Amino acid sequence: MKQIITHVTHYRYTAPVTYSIQTLRLTPRDDEHQRVLRWHIEAPGALEQQVDAYGNITHTLTLNRPHTEIELRVVGQVLVDPLAQGALGGEDSRLPVHAYCVQTALTQADDTILAFARAVLPDGLNTPADVLTLATAIHDRVAYEPGTTDVTTAAGQVLALGHGVCQDHAHLFLACVRGLGVPARYVSGYLYTTNEHAASHAWADVWLAGTGWTSVDVTNRQFASDCHCRLAVGRDYDSASPVRGVRTGGGEESMEVSVQVQTALQQ
């Protein structure tokens, strides 16, 4: 599928910011499953490109002049191939696979999470069918309800609350999978969809012996497909988020995000 993507993020501040630095993970990688045809980031300053420890393309934006707003505008086209049961295979990674067994503050598996995972998969997680079984169980346990959590909500809180959004589904899934001793990683990206879910999306990859990385969209109870454009991977939201930054000054901050994903047929 050829995806045409427009992503605008606008930050506004109630007082001047004297210095800010942001890390942008807003550029998809070329790999055997997706090809970037055209991509451009428009920002109010020079961008310094790097590749981080997870293999993500990042840009650093530094502003050392007073400002009361920042607008980041991304436009591009990506050709995404279909995946057979979400299989990505053994793609190259800067980190060893077992590095993705490490839990984080957002994905820590407490006793309740471990009991939930073991009840769903008493024989462990070994096959693509197991991946989908766990995704479905989480989907059924945690209702999709925007505005009830934020990016600091940890997996244990998500399970207790019983509602959340895509990053919450992904964090709980990662907690369960790593709790079962299987490597898994967080994925941020875009989703072409006609339903109520936002086009900015999050899902997860699981490492299966003999298969490699298998990608699953927990929120939609399905394997990732050519509707999913990958931006970044990490251990959790914090290491794969589209934008992370710090600033001096600025007072209160507000943010508006607009994401549109179309197919070539819609143009």
Where are these regions (language model features)?
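Short, surface-exposed linear segments at secondary-structure transitions and domain or protein termini
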Residues: 47-50, 98, 223-230
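Secondary-structure boundary elements
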Residues: 80-82, 93-164, 172, 237, ...
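Ser/Thr-centric signal marking residues that sit
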Residues: 9, 149, 219
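Intrinsically disordered, low-complexity N-terminal segments that are enriched in acidic
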Residues: 1-84
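Hydrophobic/aromatic-rich core segments of domains that either
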Residues: 21, 168-251
